[in-house]
């Protein structure tokens, strides 16, 4: 079975084959970096981390570009509030982002372009749009995109122009010929700091001092780093409209070619079945969550839901994820896993692959991991344990030491617990089973569960 991916553009699951055999080019809209990453950002980056891992496991060479928006109204406002330069703020936030996603085990993209490094390319694309009659200078001095002049507008979101015109979300902004038009180049304002302005004349254009609009940033960066047409464009479902719709209008309007063959969007994160927002007090940064839960538990919690489905965040769901992951590690603790190269003809591996090949079906793939763990529990097979670990690696799971995961959070230190386990073993050898049972009960009272196996006794924290 070949890989099939849900394409937002066609609203159907389609067979995937890259433009260049054996090579996949993928662009994902990344962070606007004015604050710390929250759990919604983690969900997006984790979703495409799994996509990247599975494409590589499937034998593809992957060029994965995830951009950084480092110039934006919110960034300017935050830098001014803090009394620092835009560059100082964005450097600080990028370092924090890398620390947070590194803690979650998210593999880095091939390239991570910053918007401010591609302003000449953005201006060049605006120039092409102006030449084709798709861009104009508004009365406010901004360069705007003339939406009604692009015949394919709305094809990604499925929205008609008349529907958008009537919609309450579309504000009539000063200086535009049509309220649907959007800004390509924002003219500079006196009140803005100098490091928020570029002189377009110095770069060969006559649009005055200003800065690029958000949408043109991604069009220019994706074209420059991946070419005019590439395989996969991804991002959160909230970006489908207007951001990705506007990217299509810009890139296809300028280049006359499809921007991306597949459009892939991950679902929203809700908190206790409510939208996550600072105003509701249910807004969680990655750092907040890492104070309560380990990184692998967070990863397991996120990817056991299908990437397109809504993800409901709650402590109860994370607790359940931790307990579920313990079941997998308990199997790996029974026997030292052999080093196994995956044989995709193996029945477990074949079902895992079939699940992942059907639109990155992580829930079904994880179900196979639990079945395989059950096999390890029954057979104590080092080869089966090795396959479990190797398949887990395709999802970024089960690469830690089982004992370290199972014993995390114990009240007693390791040495004290091990001393009691040794005493219990001595009591059993002396056939003093009452003493052995007392030690087991004593440890259980402190939240430590003992597991006996042919390899000896291990322990874990009680769920």
Swiss-Prot record:
It catalyses: tRNA(Cys) + L-cysteine + ATP = L-cysteinyl-tRNA(Cys) + AMP + diphosphate. ATP binds at residue 278. It is an enzyme of class 6 (ligase). CDD domains: Anticodon_Ia_Cys (cd07963), CysRS_core (cd00672). Its EC number is 6.1.1.16. Its cofactor is Zn(2+). It is found in: Cytoplasm. Belongs to the class-I aminoacyl-tRNA synthetase family. This is Cysteine--tRNA ligase. It comes from Polaromonas naphthalenivorans (strain CJ2).
